[in-house]
Amino acid sequence: MKQRELRERAAELPAEPGVYQFLEDNTVRYVGKALELRDRVRSYADPRSERIRQMVARADDIDIALTETETQALLLEANLIKRHQPRYNVRLKDDKSYPLVQFTNHSVPRIEVTRDPDSDATVFGPYTEVKRLETAVKALREVYGLRGCSDHKYNNRNRPCLEYEVGLCSAPCTGEIDATAYRSAVESAVQFFEGKTGILADPLRQEMQAAATAEEFERAANIRDRLAVIESFHGGGEAAVSSEDNSHTAETTSERAVDVLGVAIEGTTATVARLHSDNGQLVDRSQHRLNAPTGEDRASAVLTAFLTQYYAERSLPDAILCSEHPHDNDVREWLSVEGVNIRVPGTGRESKLIDLALKNARNGSVHDNESAALADALGFSIINRIEGFDVSHSQGRAVVGSNVCFIDGSAATDAYRRKRLTDTNDDYARMQELLTWRAKRACDGRDERPDPDLIVIDGGKGQLRAAREAVETTGWDVSTIALAKADELVVTPNGVHDWDADAPQLHLLQRVRDEAHRFAVQYHQSIRDDIHTVLSDVPGVGEQTQQALLRRFGSVENVRSASRDALCDVPGVGKQTADTIANRL
């Protein structure tokens, strides 16, 4: 991604907290968090290290998710890193490693605060306040007697240690507690980190009351202070959805998996943002686009369509929070029968989550605005699906063509295709060959992809003329335009458009054009490197001879099938070299 493109993309972002992801071929390469997304992403135009410079150079897109606070951004960032394992994420942002809690994978697990968890451990976090976390872990050890010693110490104990004497451990190492009881204690501690605050708060409250009754007021005060930390542990911005939220009835306490849905409508396209909370933490989000219906209650109709289409073949969450009431009673009844609590929050924490989902939905409509602007500028009723084409080669060698696809302004990499073309140094002929291939496959029903609304060619009038000849000769009814690199002029059959540099429709075409170019160059380089490797491994065949062979025969495959006499006709190739080439290839 070029500096100019990065700055332009950053300028489109809101100055709000959130998480950003640098993507390469739709693969997450880097995840970061920011208090202000716009400034943070803009800073990558001037990278601070070679590692980050390489990451930015390879990235072809940026995705974001908005959050309410930097803490929520941290938690979402950590979960996305955990899920995607991005190549360029060495540690969490700002060179800080945030603490986690792990229960080790041992027959008698230990609990500990760590910044470097075991790969097979049960892990919770990260958490932003280590003191609060250590207070919670110490309280859990006191209440449930969980060990905190290393496996080496555990395996070499023959009598209880000091931690048993002070009430921090139940001494499973010497059999002071049986395995079943210890496992039950571990399960209770795990439930606390899953969001069940009462697992720890209730026994502490009882202990505090007992101390007060016994007039041990100093001890009662200490327990009270710890209890305050425990009761706020899942509520002070650490949790997105609390399973102990007092604003709802007792039935919500069993809601571990919760989806939050927000709808934004822009013209004829609707965006549904889905936030997913698991055990009280915001762990994932996604965006989905649908055709917006006409008439009243459009958002309600969109939600109804989304609920049936999205959840028909997926696991249902325990609850779904919606920005609008779905207008179809059958959908609500279906979800109710499946045990899903669907509701529209009025106030409180859940209402804030709805606001957050709506922010993400509105942000997701930026690409829709670009598509609408492009359709407007070209006189189309709608442009949802665009395919881009480009040709790449080195002086007529290793000629390849790319075919990329964008749907609703975003790259759809599963619809990308590429093709090896005839090795000749003629850009127009090769573009015609590439488009003929695509058009014939479409007309013959051999391409499972839908026809695009628009084709974008990387080039000028010559490339566009060649592409249109291929499309029209084949009888494929698809509109075709070109985007020239030098002046960023949009060439159409009816004329040339010189749009402003900040025009949203131009940004969309540039992304399609640049992605087609990148995909073609990538494929060409892989083919070229293969050719170079095969011929360069033949003794006695230098660079000039390699070029002469490829000029004469067109490809390594043709060199391989050539007779020895034909090989000897090439300047620089004698009988011995011809024998070597034939034997090696």
Curated annotation (Swiss-Prot):
Belongs to the UvrC family. Residues 15-90 form the GIY-YIG domain. It is found in: Cytoplasm. One of its GO terms (molecular function) is excinuclease ABC activity. Residues 198-233 form the UVR domain. PANTHER family: UVRABC SYSTEM PROTEIN C, UVRC/OXIDOREDUCTASE. The keyword DNA damage applies. Pfam families: HHH_5 (PF14520), UVR (PF02151), UvrC_RNaseH (PF22920), UvrC_RNaseH_dom (PF08459). It comes from Haloquadratum walsbyi (strain DSM 16790 / HBSQ001). This is UvrABC system protein C. Keywords: Cytoplasm, DNA damage, DNA excision, DNA repair, Excision nuclease, SOS response.
